[in-house]
């Protein structure tokens, strides 16, 4: 914390630490001001076909002192979840090869709904999977992806892409691949004017997404050396 720089007028304070939470990889706040944190001990090497040792914990400040004093295990038995966001009254997580929707319906703060809403995310390198799920100002869900790629079907349409930024609706439909970056893409952020910035873990600390890829493509016709068709 000593090396973290914050804007003038802001202070950095510790909210939670071990043993309450270990190895946090991503977090999201819900509408009640509770912090949902992905805790992973499987990342990056323990790839499992079923089950796992990773969890999502709810951290709460119940006495208003700015520090977490209550922890609840929202979901467990997970394997390398890499992103989390609040949506549709629950939490959406990226956990390659799936995106999974988790929801508590009986008020005990434990997810009793666990639904795979999208599948096809690559897992051959856990460092380069899907991450940074968040709402855009267009009320669509945005995310980024590394070279592990996506090869799946959304809304009856086949997609195959990697290393870039994508978005889809909160009903898990209408996937759009918006633009490419490079290799190990993990960062995604928006300015106040909804300008989009992406970063990778190596080589590209900040990339500006000026426009969607579809607007930069040239028309290509059958019979040209290029195999694409316009």
Residue ranges and their predicted role:
Residues 1-230:
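Beta-propeller domains with acidic blade repeats across secreted/periplasmic ectodomains
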């Amino acid at each position: 914390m000593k090396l973290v720089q914050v804007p003038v007028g802001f202070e950095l304070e510790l909210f939670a630490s071990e043993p309450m939470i270990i190895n946090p990889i991503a977090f999201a706040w819900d509408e009640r001001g509770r912090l949902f944190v992905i805790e992973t001990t499987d990342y990056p090497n323990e790839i499992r076909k079923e089950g796992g040792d990773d969890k999502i914990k709810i951290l709460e400040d119940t006495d208003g002192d700015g520090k977490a004093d209550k922890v609840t295990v929202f979901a467990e038995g997970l394997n390398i979840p890499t992103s989390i966001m609040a949506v549709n009254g629950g939490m959406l997580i990226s956990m390659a090869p799936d995106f999974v929707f988790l929801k508590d319906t009986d008020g005990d703060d434990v997810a009793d709904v666990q639904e795979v809403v999208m599948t096809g995310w690559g897992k051959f390198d856990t460092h380069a999977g899907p991450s940074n799920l968040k709402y855009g100002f267009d009320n669509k869900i945005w995310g980024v992806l590394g070279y592990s790629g996506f090869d799946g079907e959304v809304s009856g349409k086949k997609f195959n892409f990697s290393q870039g930024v994508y978005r889809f609706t909160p009903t898990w439909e209408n996937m759009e691949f918006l633009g490419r970056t490079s290799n190990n893409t993990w960062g995604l952020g928006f300015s106040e004017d909804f300008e989009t910035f992406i970063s990778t873990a190596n080589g590209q600390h900040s990339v500006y997404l000026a426009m969607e890829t579809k607007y930069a493509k040239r028309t290509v016709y059958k019979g040209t050396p290029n195999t694409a068709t316009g």
